[in-house]
Amino acid sequence: MLTLNNISKSYKLGKEEVPILKHINLTVQAGEFLAIMGPSGSGKSTLMNIIGCLDRPTSGTYTLDQIDILKGKDGALAEIRNESIGFVFQTFHLLPRLTALQNVELPMIYNKVKKKERRQRAYEALEKVGLKDRVSYKPPKLSGGQKQRVAIARALVNQPRFILADEPTGALDTKSSEQILALFSELHREGKTIIMITHDPDVAKKADRTVFIRDGELVLDERGDISHA
């Protein structure tokens, strides 16, 4: 479904070229639950931004469903982000003045979905994540775990090709973290493709495959329990 081929990324610091990612090769199959692990400064955030079409590599190719998406202009990348990728962030990225329902509707507004349909789809997404009794609540009235559920509902509402989650439990307590991870596991069982960025081995255990990035390079690719790594 998704293939990164020889992806490199560097930034200029004065006259010096500073490498961030070095010749990354990665394939993610449809329905796979992949965790990407690495320490701070390893390049995993840059890799996430490239996978999420938020940044472009310096070199290499990125294909999604056999389409070379890097050939498109920035406007085309924005369209891919909205239609093909469901984002879940550590800090939720909810608009505080909007209700849970209105926050979930936002991606469909960008897609020009009619009001009646988007309301119905947003309600169904919130019901799926267990928040049908919180549709009219605004983020300041929700717990951290509930905010993340709203964010997951928003990620699902456009029926994306895959979900890209950046440290989705990083701002949550233990109980809320377990509930959110259980929800991701349920979505995976339903066939959703999930790519999760994390530094926590306990979180990565929920995935069926884990890749490790260090100093801008993929150094390990494992399936199953990675507690020994």
Swiss-Prot record:
GO cellular component: plasma membrane
Occurrences of domain ABC transporter (ranges): 2-229
Binding, ATP: 38-45
Enzyme Commission identifier(s): 7.-.-.-
Cross-referenced Pfam families: ABC_tran
Entry annotated with the keyword Cytoplasm: no
Name listed for the protein in its UniProt record: Uncharacterized ABC transporter ATP-binding protein YvrO
